[in-house]
């Protein structure tokens, strides 16, 4: 069973390809979070968790969801992370720790580069660059699916001292300093479609007088700002004039 969390579609694309090649079921963590349902999942096949890298680990919301969810059947767990560039740091160690604490058998963590979507800090590539990055990522996902199918663990990656730092003490500091929704604003280009509120996996966006209002529980998934059809949402002055990136399928 393949579970995925995705803001703008990178991890959704990865999960969709892996699930197709494994002929396995795909479950949206976004939808589970949105509905707030406590569910039990049973799978006789390995569990695959697909998500973006947030501050050099799996996203906190994904870890919290895994801890709060009941899984039955096959205890083997693989982690596939998408990243906009850079490194996965020491994310594998924290995924292994999560497995040890929740009763899973850790089978490894692997990451693949996908187009940058974090426009609250960086810039999204051009359309042609995005297409090239995705084309390079697809064989990586195929290889990972093959390893899962054969029951092989993902190979361990070497971790530098810097990687241990950014995934370790810097991770909670990054969340504390930067993962906030106070910087989001909306312009008069807003057409009150409500897409941002519908897509927010944490139900953090409400509509007041036809405009989005953020409620203070943001994970910076970029679903709202990148998915806005009129590009009416900005993050401080950082995102102004920047290309949006969104390949999410509803």
Positions of predicted regions on the chain:
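FMN-binding flavodoxin-like domain, especially the glycine-rich phosphate-binding loop
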Residues: 2, 6-14, 20-33, 37-51, ...
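Generic structural motif recognizing short loop/turn segments at the entrances and edges of beta-strands
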Residues: 22-25, 180-182, 210
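Generic structural signal for beta-strand residues in well-ordered domains
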Residues: 40-41, 70, 177, 198, ...
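Repeat-unit-sized solenoid/scaffold elements
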Residues: 122-125, 149, 175-186, 220
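A mid-sequence, solvent-exposed acidic-amphipathic segment
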Residues: 160-192, 198
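Iron-sulfur cluster-binding cysteine motifs and their immediate structural context
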Residues: 185-186, 191, 195-219, 223-240
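Active-site-proximal loop/hinge segments that shape catalytic or ion-binding/gating pockets
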Residues: 245-249
């Amino acid at each position: 069973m393949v579970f995925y969390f995705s803001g703008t579609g990178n991890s959704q694309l990865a999960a969709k390809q892996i699930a197709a090649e494994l002929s396995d079921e795909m479950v949206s963590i976004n939808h589970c979070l949105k509905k707030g349902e406590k569910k039990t999942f049973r799978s006789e096949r390995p569990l695959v968790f697909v998500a973006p890298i947030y501050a050099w680990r799996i996203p906190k919301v994904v870890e919290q969801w895994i801890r709060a969810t009941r899984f039955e059947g096959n205890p083997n767990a693989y982690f596939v992370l998408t990243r906009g560039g850079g490194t996965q740091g020491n994310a594998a160690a924290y995924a292994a720790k999560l497995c040890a604490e929740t009763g899973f058998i850790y089978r490894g963590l692997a990451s693949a580069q996908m187009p940058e979507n974090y426009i609250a800090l960086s810039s999204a590539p051009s359309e042609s660059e995005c297409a090239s990055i995705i084309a390079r990522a697809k064989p990586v996902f195929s290889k990972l699916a093959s390893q899962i199918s054969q029951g092989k663990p993902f190979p361990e990656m070497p971790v530098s001292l810097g990687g241990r730092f950014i995934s370790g003490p810097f991770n909670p500091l990054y969340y504390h300093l930067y993962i906030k929704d106070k910087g989001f604003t909306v312009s008069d280009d807003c057409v009150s479609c409500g897409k941002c509120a519908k897509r927010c996996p944490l139900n953090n966006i409400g509509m007041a007088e036809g405009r989005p209002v953020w409620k203070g529980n943001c994970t910076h998934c970029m679903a709202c700002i990148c998915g806005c059809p009129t590009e009416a949402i900005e993050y401080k002055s950082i995102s102004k004039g920047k290309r949006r990136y969104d390949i999410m399928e509803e």
